[in-house]
Amino acid sequence: MNELEFVTLHRRHLHQYPELSLHEFETTSYITSFLEDLGVPYDRPLKTGVIAYLEGNSHHTIAFRADIDALPIYEENDIDFKSKNDNVMHACGHDGHTTALMLFVKRCKALYDKSELPHNVVFIFQPAEETGGGANRLIKAGAFDKYPIEAVFGFHVNPFEKEGKIVIRDEEITASATEYRFFLKGLSSHVADKEQGHSCGEGLQHVLSQIGQIQQFHLNGLKRNIIHMGHFEAGEAINTVPSHGYLEGTIRTYDTEDLAIVKHQMHKIAKSVQLLFNVECEVKFEEGYPPTMNHPQLRQAVENAIKGANLEIVEKKLPFLFGEDFSFYGQQLAPSYFVFVGTQNNEKGFVTGLHTAHLNFDEKILIDVVNYYEHLLRNYKEV
């Protein structure tokens, strides 16, 4: 079996059997069976996910990560390897990420068997990137305590960049993701006696209008930020004053000062609702993933590896506004570098975005990724 056949076989199997965050049991079994067949040792520090390891010819230890979970999306692709799990799909390309790392394990094991593996390698098949913060869970569980990891590398497919191109950026490359929720409690009454009630409906209207003002009047317009309202509700009947209200959304920013400003303004909005509409109003925040920071000291190694793999470098001027839990590795484990690999192919119709029901790509790009990884490994110099 050649490498294209390898990545096609494994990626399409994984694509047919996607599993949601923290439920990647069959995916984990598939990976461990593959590792056992190769004779590669591994650990399972969590219920799902796998950490594999090969010892090389130096004291340097480098880690490579792939996320393995899928999304609650019904697949609409008309393909013979369409998802067989109802309303679950690899709509973010993690089937490709996993397959690429499997091929990289295979290459590294071949080098190991010939005593030619240049450095120690940790292979991270990580669960729960989409929800659950699998990277942070692995770190907190001590999964890497026995490995003196010096650098962590990872990638994500990018359907908005053409095949053969890799997008890089020093410092922030993805945004932080913070969820916010407004809770309103008022007093219900019949609509004919609405003056007897305290309307959460009007309170919600105020929250909505004021959230829209934050970005316009309180944040630097030259920076990229998103304050998105995703869901709201109030009341239960058409002829009553709503006694409760709820609104939730997400904040995407790569600047901690901007995030602090947004939170401060939202607290002010909650207080103003209480004063203006005589309803209780509280806002709560759930911290998601911090910005993914690419460490500049790894830049030259990444550039050299991309060029060595005969791929094209695309310099990203501004960070992506995705959230990505790869950020925890750079924040808590070791210097890290995360890139985006182009998968766009207009002739084959591979043009739809991430988290859509039609995401697809040509498996050959996974070999490009592994070539890039191998160049990183062979030419790695201590940070």
Curated annotation (Swiss-Prot):
Q: Which residues form the signal peptide?
A: none
Presence of keyword Hydrolase: yes
User: Keyword Plastid: yes or no?
Assistant: no
Q: Which UniProt keywords apply?
A: Hydrolase
User: EC number(s) in its UniProt entry?
Assistant: 3.-.-.-
Please give one Pfam family short name. Answer: Peptidase_M20
The terms under GO molecular function for this entry are: hydrolase activity
Organism superkingdom = Bacteria
Matching entries from SUPFAM superfamilies are given as:
Bacterial exopeptidase dimerisation domain, Zn-dependent exopeptidases
Family annotation (Gene3D superfamilies): 3.30.70.360, Zn peptidases (3.40.630.10)
Family, according to the entry, reads as follows: Belongs to the peptidase M20 family.
This one is known as Uncharacterized hydrolase SE_1078
Which organism does this sequence originate in?
Staphylococcus epidermidis (strain ATCC 12228 / FDA PCI 1200)
Give the organism's phylogenetic lineage: Bacteria, Bacillati, Bacillota, Bacilli, Bacillales
